[in-house]
Amino acid sequence: GDALAAALVEARGFTRGDFLRLHPSGQLGRKLSLRVHEVMHPANRVAVGQPETRVKEILLRMTERPLGAACVVREDGTLAGIFTDGDLRRGLEDNENLLSEPVGHVMTTEPVAAHPEMDLQTAADLMEQRRSQIAVLPVIEPATRQLLGLLRLHDIHQPALD
């Protein structure tokens, strides 16, 4: 239903606002009405480290806070990068001593990020409409790049929020 409606929205020149007003209860309506800050995991529940933190320590933090990624921040709290299982796999291909390396050597620098007022559909588009799809987005304050939290694709596609 929502996929067909989305195609009609595009074909007839409806804006996202028009669709939200006319179909607020569907999945797409939910994604257009909710903002990232309403469903993200706050920074205090995210695995976080600094560029010099060893990969082994980052992995332990990711085990304690299992969201699929760790955010890497500078001393001032600004986002330096993100470390995912993909970074781990690529790193292990090149370096069997990866666990003792600083995460800054293998993290993704300048990751795609969301801001707290972004609607969920825009965030989903950032993750899905790219050559290499991603499953998590750091959430940052746009003006300062301070880490605010983490958003997973899974969180966006949940049928309903409690």
Residue ranges and their predicted role:
Residues L32-V46, S100-P111:
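Bateman (tandem CBS) regulatory domains
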Residues F14-F19, V72-E75:
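Flexible, glycine/charged-enriched surface loops at secondary-structure junctions
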Residues G1-F14:
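Short alpha-helices
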Residues G17-M40:
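Cyclic nucleotide-binding regulatory module and flanking cytosolic helices
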Residues L67, T78-E93, Q146-D162:
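Short beta->alpha transition motifs characteristic of CBS
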Residues L4, V39, M62, G77, ...:
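Terminal peptide-recognition signature
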Residues V48-P66, V73, L92, A113-P142, ...:
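The conserved cystathionine-beta-synthase
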Residues G81, D85, E96-S100, L120:
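Nucleotide-binding motor/catalytic cores of P-loop/tubulin-like NTPases across gene-expression machines
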